[in-house]
Amino acid sequence: MAPLQQVWGDDYNKALCGAKVALCFMSKLNKDTYTRRCFEIPATNTVLISEYSDELSSLYNAGVEADFFKSKQDLIQILHRYVDDEAYRESVAKAGHKRVVVDGHDVVSRMKMVLEWFNEIKNKDLK
């Protein structure tokens, strides 16, 4: 196993783009049910493997667009499947990326939404 280190900015993007799979852990302190990483990872055509939450499992089809684990044993089994089966891994990565774009979780779609909200507020204030 390669040495682990934290990465930020461009290095974070390069790390995700170069990974076969990427793990996502939720903050217990914040009681996360999903995080921005749940969109960033598939946006880079990398398979998202995350702790299970009801909310997150409603955003992606498990085993088709992303994958979720509830225990250490689940995680190990899931990792073996993705590392051992390149065609399956690539299929899930591609489907996950498509889900992010189709559902509007990409940066461009989010920015359009923010600008629409801004214009709605601005137009209300002008009336």
Predicted features along the sequence, with ranges:
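Catalytic binding pocket for nucleotide-activated donors in carbohydrate/polymer assembly enzymes
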Residues: 1-127
